[in-house]
Amino acid sequence: MRAIRLLAVSGSLRRASTNTAALEALARLAPEGVKVLLYRDLATLPPFNPDDDIEEKPKPEPVETLRALVSASDALVIAAPEYAHGLPGALKNALDWLVASETFAASPLCSSIRRPALSTHRRPCARSFPRWLRA
């Protein structure tokens, strides 16, 4: 039986991020049969522009890499801080690139929202990510 593959994404770009630390702990403590890959290239993604995401146009390499990692994973795990009562911009940018891709629609997504202010984002996220599990 093959291992369950989780792609873990921290919404924080800080070097000493507690969200990244939590995902690193998840990777270390994952039970046998669960493989966790921590995606560390959020800052390399270019700003999302729908004009750049058409079939005839090659995608930026960081976008292709992220989409391939999501496609190869059984689920996506996100840990993110709250910035200005919302999602961090770098994370929102990554989600925009992923939502534009058909491969993301079937991916289960687990996120942890620690602040009540972010709960207002759950409804639109649930529409964009039909398999979103809230922890």
Go through each PLM region and give its residues.
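Short, glycine-/small-residue-rich phosphate/pyrophosphate-handling segment
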Residues: T18, S107-A135
